[in-house]
From Swiss-Prot:
Binding-site residues, [4Fe-4S] cluster: C276, C316
Keywords noted in UniProt: 4Fe-4S, Iron, Iron-sulfur, Metal-binding
Obligatory cofactor(s): [4Fe-4S] cluster
Organism ancestry: Archaea, Methanobacteriati, Methanobacteriota, Methanomada group, Methanococci
SUPFAM superfamilies given in the database record: Actin-like ATPase domain (SSF53067)
Protein name: Uncharacterized protein MJ0800
Gene Ontology MF annotations: 4 iron, 4 sulfur cluster binding; metal ion binding
Subunit record text: Homodimer.
Organism field: Methanocaldococcus jannaschii (strain ATCC 43067 / DSM 2661 / JAL-1 / JCM 10045 / NBRC 100440) (Methanococcus jannaschii)
Cofactor note: Binds 1 [4Fe-4S] cluster per dimer.
InterPro entries given in the database record: ATPase_BadF, ATPase_NBD, CoA_E_activase_dom, Dehydratase_Activator_Redct, Methan_mark_15
Length: 415
C-alpha cells in the first residue's frame, strides 16, 4: 500500500473562507495528507520576534509559529504548502518570508498559493501533484546531468516535441504541430532519432510530459511519466545552467503560459494563464499571418519597431488583432505593429501572472515564443531586468523529461 505524503499546511484564512476543504480534497487526490504543526500560545509569543517585523494578524502569527516548529524539527512533515488570501498584502509578505526560512533551514519542498474565496480543488491539483512528485522523486529531481542515451517527449496541446540526449548533450530534436497525439509523438520522435543518428532500440530510457503524457507514455513504454511543472522547471534551469539558488521561469506556450518561481531548480510558486489567448503564441501566429511574414520574421520586425506608435485598446486576441488591423489600414509600419503585439503579450504576462509569483533573478524565458527577438526585448523593457533565453528554450519539457528519465538507467541495467 502506497504511503500518503505528509504535507504541512501553513495558511491564514483558508478555514473561514471555505478554501480549506478544497485544499484537503486536492491533496487527497494526489496521495497527500494534510498535517498541522502543533504550537501553544507561549511558543507563538516566543518566536514572533524572529520574523523581523511586527505582524498584526493573529492567524499570520500562528502561521509563522507553525513554520518555526517545522524548522526546529517538531513535525514529521515531508512537504509544505503555504497559502494566504490574495487580498492580504501582509499575508503575501509573511508567506514569502516563511518560504525563504523553510527553504534555507530545511530540505523540505515548498509550494505557495494565493487563494480567493472561489478557489476549487481542480485549481490546486497541479500544485499538489508537483509537491507530492517532489517528495516521491526527490533524488531523481536532484539530478544535474544526463547520462547514457535518453529520449524525452513533451506532448503539448499545440505542439509535440521530442529530444534525444546522449551523454549530457542534445543530439537530436523533433518539433511538430499536435494533431493525433500518438501519431504526432511518433513523427517527432522519428525526427529526433534521425537527427541523432540512432534507432529507438538504442534508447536506454524514455520520459514523457505534457497534456498527452499518459497516452504517449503508455505507447512508448516510458520509464518516467511526470507532470510538466517539475519537468519544465528542471529543463529550463538545466538549459540556462541555473540549477542552484533562485530563478523565475516564464513559459509562453501555444495556448497558455506559465510563470514559475524556482529554488534549486524545483518549483515553489506557480501560476498559469489560459483564459485569454491574447498572451500566448497563438496571438503571434495570427499577427504574423496578418502581416504576411513567418514567426521568425515577426520577431525580427518587432525588434525594430516602436510599440508606442500603435494604439491597442484590448489584450483580447480578437479585439487586439482588430486594433492591429486598424493600425495597418491607417498606414502604420509593419515593424511597429509587430512591436505592439510583442509589448501587448509582455504587459499581459506581467500584469496578470507575474503579480501572483515571487519574481526572482535570473528570469528565464522559454517556450516557442521565446525565439521571437522582439518579445525578449519587450519582456526586458516591461520587467526592467535582463532575460535569459537558453539554447533549445522551446524544448524545455522534452529536455527535462530526457534528463530526468536517465536516472532510471542504472536501475534498468541491473535488472
Amino acid at each position: 500500500m502506497k504511503l500518503m505524503v505528509k504535507i504541512a499546511l501553513l495558511t491564514c484564512g483558508a478555514e473561514w473562507s471555505g478554501v480549506y476543504h478544497e485544499i484537503e480534497k486536492a491533496a487527497q487526490k494526489v496521495g497527500g495528507e494534510l498535517i498541522f504543526p502543533e504550537v501553544d500560545l507561549s511558543y507563538i509569543d516566543e518566536v514572533e520576534d524572529r520574523l523581523g517585523f511586527k505582524v498584526g494578524s493573529a492567524n499570520l502569527k500562528l502561521m509563522f509559529a507553525r513554520a518555526m516548529s517545522i524548522i526546529e524539527g517538531n513535525t514529521d512533515a515531508e512537504a509544505v504548502f503555504i497559502a494566504t488570501c490574495f487580498r492580504c498584502a501582509e499575508g503575501a509578505l509573511v508567506r514569502n518570508e516563511v518560504r525563504k526560512l523553510i527553504q534555507q533551514n530545511t530540505n523540505l519542498p515548498v509550494v505557495m498559493y494565493s487563494f480567493t474565496e472561489r478557489t476549487k480543488a481542480s485549481e490546486l491539483l497541479t500544485r499538489m501533484e508537483a509537491l507530492t512528485t517532489i517528495v516521491e522523486r526527490k533524488s531523481l529531481l536532484a539530478r544535474k546531468k544526463q547520462e547514457g542515451i535518453s529520449l524525452g517527449i513533451d506532448s503539448g496541446s499545440t505542439t509535440t516535441k521530442a529530444v534525444v540526449m546522449i551523454d549530457d548533450e542534445v543530439a537530436g530534436t523533433g518539433w511538430i504541430y499536435t494533431k493525433d497525439v500518438i501519431e504526432s509523438a511518433k513523427e517527432a520522435v522519428n525526427n529526433a532519432l534521425k537527427e541523432a543518428g540512432i534507432s529507438l532500440d538504442q534508447v536506454e530510457t524514455i520520459g514523457t510530459t505534457g497534456y498527452g503524457r499518459y497516452t504517449v507514455g503508455e505507447y512508448f513504454k516510458a520509464d518516467l511519466i511526470q507532470e510538466e511543472l517539475t519537468v519544465n522547471s528542471k529543463g529550463a534551469a538545466y538549459l540556462a545552467d541555473k540549477q542552484e539558488g533562485e530563478a523565475t521561469v516564464i513559459d509562453i506556450g501555444g495556448m497558455d503560459n506559465k510563470a514559475i518561481s524556482l529554488y534549486d531548480a524545483i518549483p515553489d510558486g506557480f501560476t498559469m494563464g489560459g483564459i485569454c489567448a491574447g498572451a500566448s503564441g497563438r496571438f503571434f501566429e495570427i499577427t504574423a499571418r496578418r502581416l504576411g511574414v513567418s514567426l521568425q520574421e515577426l520577431g525580427e520586425l518587432a525588434a525594430k519597431g516602436d510599440w508606442r506608435k500603435i494604439k491597442m485598446n484590448s489584450y483580447c486576441i480578437v479585439f487586439g488583432i482588430q486594433d492591429l488591423v486598424t493600425a495597418l489600414a491607417e498606414g502604420a509600419k509593419a515593424e511597429d505593429v509587430a512591436a505592439a503585439a510583442a509589448h501587448s503579450v509582455a504587459e499581459q504576462v506581467f500584469e496578470q501572472q507575474l503579480q501572483e509569483v515571487d519574481v526572482r533573478d535570473p528570469v528565464i524565458l522559454v517556450g516557442g515564443s521565446s525565439l521571437l527577438k522582439g518579445l525578449v526585448i519587450a519582456m526586458e523593457e516591461v520587467l526592467g531586468r535582463k532575460i535569459i533565453v537558453p539554447r533549445y528554450s522551446q524544448l524545455i519539457g522534452a529536455v527535462g523529461a530526457a534528463l530526468l528519465s536517465s536516472g532510471y538507467r542504472y536501475k534498468k541495467m541491473k535488472a
